[in-house]
Amino acid sequence: MSKDFSNWYVIKRDNETLVPFDDKKITKAISNAIKAVNNIDKSTNELTEKTVTDEVLKLLNDHIRYNVSGDVVFSVEEIQNCVEKALVTLGLYEVAKEYITYREKRNQLRMMKSSLMQTYQDFIMNLFLK
């Protein structure tokens, strides 16, 4: 799908940072999930990546909303949800399972890092306040 994404942005998990939308990141995530499921030949993998990426872009296009500047903005979660939906819609259930599992592991890791940072900050504050 050839599309101009120059006014598409992704709001990062900090809910402040806007970065340019990059459909190649979607393709890479799909590719990683496919590779984790099985070792298929490169041409089949690339065809599947393109098909799924195109489906994700269609789903995103159906959910476009504009910010005050007239730019299209999606959250990371919205994009990931569309990837999951595209994988299931296209019948790639094992790939969807791998993608969802990886996504959940990353979420748990982020939560652990956040908890660890909070513990560290509390420790430092207690150390200097005593």
Question: Where are the model-predicted features located?
Answer:
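Extended catalytic cores of very large enzyme megasubunits
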Residues: 1-130
